Amino acid sequence: MKPFPTHPDAIPAELQDVMDRLGSVAIEVANRIARGGIDEDLAGLCGTNTDGDGQKALDVIADDAFRVALEGSAVRFYASEEQDTAVTLNEAGTLALAIDPLDGSSNIDTNLSVGTTFAIWPAAPRPNPSFLRLGSELIAAGYVIYGPQVCMMVSFGKGTQKYVLDPGSRSFVLVDRAVKVPPSSTEFAINASNYRHWPKPIRAYIDDCVAGTEGPRGRNFNMRWLASLVAETHRILARGGVFLYPRDSRKGYEQGRLRYLYECAPIAFVITQAGGGATDGENPILGQTPSRLHARTPFVFGSAEKVARITAYHDLPEQETSALFGNRGLFRS
């Protein structure tokens, strides 16, 4: 059975075959994760990627599976977190696909949700120009989350769709054609252990949230942190709120930690198509062009009002950050 047997009109015809291939591999990856520890150790380290990050066994397994499945498809160039350079799959192809085959793989041994993120551009004649381009030129992007439910959230530029994997039929069922980010929430996600390294506008924003009813926001907030980008995204699409992974003063974190091409760009596309916002803290993510395949960027996304507020903190002169948003009690929503 095809992985997307229902609502054939929901996927553009020129992308149907590629989506079928992505969906089929996602179903197999989900099954492999569910059997982790029975047949093999999926959490064991087996190498490092181009940026020196440790690769889990399932990182490599998933990358190989997606790459092989896309051979002979319309995908001309394939760029992966697990590959140093882009790979040519089909010289006659018309698409360029960037992918993180297994985002959040550090969570495999703890049984927390992990996922796959992907982004699709029209292919240029050569690999680098196909990928080193504006995020706004994406024609499709999405993610799969392997959790209690296996879900795919995807956009083809006309809103964000939600599919749920039916284990019985081993197919993805369209359950929502127009997912929307809730406009308001009292949740924010950030790794607070890095507070001392953050830029002042980020610290000021978090300080105001932590102050709760006694602070300028006049309400209490809850902090979340899962260390899984797809899990954080899925929660925000369901409940609203904001995710922050800012640049900081540590060596190697000056431009944040998340990769633009196959992490931030696809998530930003899905979120903005669902009515949310996505920036690097100051400027829209989709208005940026990465300088290299594995370029990093600070990342802030979520409910549009929350993202706009954080941008406004950056726009203020340093001496006004606390005064305008604190003592004067503006923007209390």
Curated annotation (Swiss-Prot):
Fructose-1,6-bisphosphatase II is not light-activated. InterPro entries: FBPase_C_dom, FBPase_class-1, FBPase_N, FBPtase, Fructose_bisphosphatase_AS. GO terms for cellular component: cytosol. Transmembrane segments: none annotated. One of its GO terms (biological process) is fructose 6-phosphate metabolic process. Mg(2+) 2 binds at D100, D103, E263. It is found in: Cytoplasm. Its EC number is 3.1.3.11. It catalyses: beta-D-fructose 1,6-bisphosphate + H2O = beta-D-fructose 6-phosphate + phosphate. Mg(2+) 1 binds at E81, D100, L102. Pathway: Carbohydrate biosynthesis; gluconeogenesis. Its cofactor is Mg(2+). NCBIfam families: PRK09293.1-4. HAMAP family: FBPase_class1. PANTHER family: FRUCTOSE-1,6-BISPHOSPHATASE-RELATED, SEDOHEPTULOSE-1,7-BISPHOSPHATASE, CHLOROPLASTIC. Homotetramer. This is Fructose-1,6-bisphosphatase class 1 1. The gene is fbp1.
